[in-house]
Amino acid sequence: MIANTATFLEALVELFPTCKAVYFQNSGKLFTAEAIRNHTIPRESRFIYFAVNVRFFNIQGTDDMMVDSLGMNTLFLPDLQYHFHEMEPNWVVNHAYNVLSYIFDNENPIESGDPIDGIVDGAMSREVMWRCQYENALIQPVRE
């Protein structure tokens, strides 16, 4: 079923040829129908690309930053949240997309307390391990 999600999207824009754009309510992403019709995204990456959004926030009055995701809950999979400082935020955004792809491809094998590869010089690395923790989202919308 998961593999057919993006195929369903492509079928919809073909069934409605006058469609101008598609808005993904769960993630807040908007794509033109033309972008969906003409994409070259590999099948296994389409759901993450089209239906999942990774957001970045500066925490006001601090040096802290936040990266989180929206959209995985569409398939009853967990979204991610990173609370950090003194790290390049684009590295964290890329890390989030990599972890989201892993969760999607493997039907969420990560449990609270499990270690995952961290980031060294912008790349995922086993030199630094991060511990996963399931908790409620700090930024709206409410999700677990």
Residue ranges and their predicted role:
Residues 4:
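Short, well-structured alpha-helical interface segments that form or flank functional binding sites
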Residues 8-23, 101-111:
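Structural alpha-beta junctions
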Residues 27-144:
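Aromatic/basic-lined ligand-recognition segments
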